[in-house]
Amino acid sequence: MLARHRTKRIYRRGHTTEILRLLSSLSQSYSPRHYIFADSDKMSEDKIRTFEQKRAETFSNSQFTLNRIPRCREVCQSWSSSVLTTLYSILYSFPLTFRLKPDLILCNGPGTCVPVCISALLLEILALKKVIIVYVESICRVETLSLSGKILYYFSDYFIVQWPALKEKYPKSIYLGRIV
């Protein structure tokens, strides 16, 4: 079953490239696409725009939105102070997630995805919307999960890993081989 609204999480560096590779294989049924990324992440925004411009050449009525949220944790920020910035990011994310009411969240990588996924879980707890959360752990994670992965392993509907060692350690995960 394909739903009308899809939400994609985008991240800096290689995470953006990984998620865009996944999206390149999706049909036009996954439209509109709502990208959510850190408000300070200009590089991902540029990559998304380029990706969507190329996609529009194939799918003429391709629709997408760009949405920014506060970053949970800046590089070199202390773990103790990141609790407050993460809570702020969750509070900021909930109205956005409520407005979009996505059917699916496809996410990978750094902590920016955690507030959006928590917001989606709140929608379900409040009986407003069941959002399917698909987390794809980065290809770079060979033996251990990222912090986001360790958190979302318990809350995602589908948790995909790209290395057999991770499947052995995390039995709920789905191993599909290298998918990005």
Placement of each model-derived feature along the sequence:
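Nucleotide-activated sugar donor-binding and catalytic core shared by glycosyltransferases
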Residues: 1-180
